[in-house]
């Protein structure tokens, strides 16, 4: 069995292929995309000592960004700045998101509600202007700073046309 041990700063150019496991202790940075059959995180369990917690990344045919939260209606309405509500600088949401959709759910009552997004402002309105229910909301926007992917292609993973479009 061959082994490669690297210490210190190392620069590699060109394609690097490895079979088997690779462990990186510390920070790794890519300027392109990471292509994998699945991607997961594995962290120390936040509640149970000695346990680990694993989750798989959400996968989709679009580069969607998901923002969510809760709000309480005042006089049947609530407005949320998606930037401020998610700790982002004003203008960030509009700069990186296109094809925006919102989803709303009334968590504490039966009053009908609807949501709309204009720029970074999510407006949630109830059917009645006296509603003070708590609403869960989710806004999804497709990244506009990268090209759309080609979902299906013919060939092997090395032929993937998306390897150059997501950088």
Name what the model sees in each region:
Residues 1-32:
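Register-specific beta-strand positions within repetitive beta-rich fiber domains
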């Amino acid at each position: 069995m061959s082994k490669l041990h690297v210490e210190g700063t190392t620069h590699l150019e060109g394609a690097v292929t490895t079979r088997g496991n690779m462990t990186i202790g510390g920070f790794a940075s890519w300027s392109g995309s990471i292509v994998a059959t699945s991607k997961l995180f594995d962290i120390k369990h936040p509640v149970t000592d000695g346990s680990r917690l694993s989750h798989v990344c959400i996968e989709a045919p679009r580069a969607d960004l998901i923002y969510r939260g809760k709000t309480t209606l005042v006089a049947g309405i609530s407005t949320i700045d998606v930037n401020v509500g998610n700790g982002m600088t004003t203008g960030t949401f509009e700069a990186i998101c296109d094809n925006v959709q919102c989803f709303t759910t009334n968590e504490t009552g039966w009053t009908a509600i609807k949501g709309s997004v204009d720029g970074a402002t999510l407006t949630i309105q109830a059917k009645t202007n006296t509603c003070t229910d708590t609403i869960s909301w989710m806004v999804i926007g497709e990244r506009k700073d990268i090209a759309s992917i080609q979902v299906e292609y013919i060939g092997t993973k090395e032929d993937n046309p998306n390897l150059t479009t997501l950088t």
